[in-house]
UniProtKB/Swiss-Prot annotation:
Protein name per UniProt: UDP-N-acetylmuramoyl-L-alanyl-D-glutamate--2,6-diaminopimelate ligase
Functional note: Catalyzes the addition of meso-diaminopimelic acid to the nucleotide precursor UDP-N-acetylmuramoyl-L-alanyl-D-glutamate (UMAG) in the biosynthesis of bacterial cell-wall peptidoglycan.
GO biological process: cell division; cell wall organization; peptidoglycan biosynthetic process; regulation of cell shape
Major localization class: cytoplasm
A Pfam family the protein falls into: Mur_ligase_C
Pathway(s) of this molecule: Cell wall biogenesis; peptidoglycan biosynthesis
SUPFAM superfamilies: MurD-like peptide ligases, catalytic domain (SSF53623), MurD-like peptide ligases, peptide-binding domain (SSF53244), MurE/MurF N-terminal domain (SSF63418)
Length: 483
């Protein structure tokens, strides 16, 4: 695409002569800017992109998109008050509005986004729809798989990923949509066909400032749905109705504890999985899955509901296929070589930890003990730290350790957590590797060990370095050294 085409009729002030020259790329990183690129000078958390516009021009940028005019730059400048909106607009235009050529499902909620997204994608594939995935663990763009640190990529990358999906002849995409991604405009200009709400509980208050603003951010996905789209909500969530009320799309519900369009009843759990019946339009459909726990029944229901609403067809066939689905990496993932059951899970919010501990406690023998290794991330919501302790001590014995401390003092984070304990059913070991060893060493064959918080992650972030750290590998190493 040429510069004059890209900038035609955009709501911005343009300084300099806009010529018909090819645009190679859009980028936020001045270091990666090359000849023919447009540099987006955004104000970030750590630095101001406007400070690097000169470097971008030296590297070959043909235009700068910013909220400020710089009289010392010799290239075209695109100046707008709403940089977020225009960045998303240009990204979509540059990649020829790829989301309009895909059936895009957006999944939002405090917990369960990754599992619901993965299950929905697998069900779509089973029904013959080549489907991409944008999510926490990986982005699947047809034959290409990308690992990224963001649940929802920035607007430029997201449109680029959609374009690659179209190029690979995919017809659908499932996107994990975080509240932060919504608030930062990362999914602006993405045309969603469906939205799924998993649940809403305490998270990301460090970013949003209040729980009310957190909910408002999540609602943006449902406001953006078209009238011919579908809004799928968990009716057991107290906020579900408010999401349906603000959405132009057709509302569909799923639930376990109350009436809904898709309702699960007769739930039974074991270490091998879950069985339940689904009530839909007066019929009963028996469902079995290798995924364990009530929270995973919700996840399965959400995936089934949205896929069935989009594709239609034989619901019984779709339900039957659920038995072949598996949980994403790091979601209540068992490690099979230990003296007692050991699970790794991404649970890093109070609700998520409660869900996982609840099901594992149900799998314990009467004289067994649940041993929980967990910490809390640094530079994130402080208020949930003592709440995590209260949840953990309800179910078992805790080994409190470090998660991703980031720029904070790990010992202070641990102190914040421990302020929530009302008993002495915990020990402290700030070194996560040693904490895992300690938990496994104290476990008896009738116990269960849960290593929570990091799940699929293969790194640990400290103030001055990021190290390789995989909970699963550390568990296996600990088992090899102990037994």
């Amino acid at each position: 695409m040429h510069l004059d085409q890209l900038l035609r009729d955009i709501p911005a002030k343009i300084y300099g002569k806009v010529e018909s020259i090819p645009v190679r790329n859009l980028t936020r990183d001045s270091r990666c800017t090359g000849v023919g690129d447009i540099f987006i000078a955004r104000q970030g958390q750590m630095c101001n992109g406007n400070d690097y516009s000169g470097q971008a021009v030296e590297n070959g940028a043909i235009a700068i998109l910013s909220s400020l005019y710089n009289p010392f730059l010799s290239v075209v400048q695109i100046v707008t008050e709403d940089l977020t909106a225009l960045e998303a607009c240009l990204a979509a235009r540059f990649y020829n509005d790829p989301s309009k050529r895909l059936d895009v499902i957006g999944v939002t909620g405090t917990n369960g986004k990754t599992t619901v997204s993965a299950l929905a994608r697998e069900l779509m594939e089973y029904k013959g729809r080549c489907t991409g995935l944008v999510g926490t663990i990986e982005h699947i763009l047809g034959e290409h798989r990308i690992i990224d640190s963001f649940t929802t990529p920035d607007a430029i990358l997201l449109q680029k990923y959609f374009a690659e999906m179209v190029k690979q002849n995919l017809s659908s995409a499932v996107v994990e949509v975080s509240s932060i991604g919504l608030a930062l405009g990362r999914v602006r200009e993405t045309e969603f066909l469906a939205g799924v709400l998993t649940n809403v509980s305490l998270d990301h208050l460090d970013f949003h400032g209040s729980f009310e603003e957190y909910v408002v951010a999540k609602k943006q996905l449902f406001v953006s749905l078209p009238e011919h789209g579908v809004a799928v909500v968990n009716s057991d969530c107290e906020y579900a109705q408010s999401f349906l009320e603000i959405s132009p799309a057709r509302g569909v519900s799923y639930a376990v504890h109350q009436e809904a369009d898709y309702r699960a009843v007769n739930l039974k759990f074991s270490s091998l999985g879950s069985t339940f019946d689904i009530l839909y339009q007066g019929n009963v459909f028996s469902c079995e899955t290798s995924l364990v726990g009530e929270h995973n029944v919700y996840n399965v229901l959400a995936a089934l509901s949205v896929v069935h609403q989009i594709l239609g067809g034989d619901f019984a066939e779709l339900v039957h296929y659920v038995r072949y689905l598996s949980a994403p990496k790091g979601r209540l993932e068992p490690v099979l070589s230990g003296p007692c059951p050991i699970y790794i899970d991404y649970a890093h919010t109070p609700d998520a930890l409660d869900n996982v501990c609840k099901i594992l406690s149900q799998l314990l023998p009467a004289d067994g003990r649940l041993i929980i290794v967990f910490g809390c991330g640094g530079d994130r919501d402080h208020s949930k730290r003592p709440i995590m302790a209260k949840v953990a001590e309800t179910y078992g014995f805790s080994v409190v350790t470090s998660d991703n401390p980031r720029t904070e003092d790990p010992d202070q984070i641990i102190a914040d957590i421990c302020s929530g304990f009302s008993t002495d059913r915990y020990v402290i070991e700030s070194d996560r590797r040693l904490a895992i060893v300690k938990a496994i060493s104290m476990a008896l064959d009738k116990d269960i060990v849960l290593v929570a918080g990091k799940g699929h992650e293969v790194y640990q972030i400290f103030k001055h370095q990021t190290i390789v750290f995989d909970d699963r590998e550390v568990v296996c190493e600990a088992l090899a050294s102990i037994y």
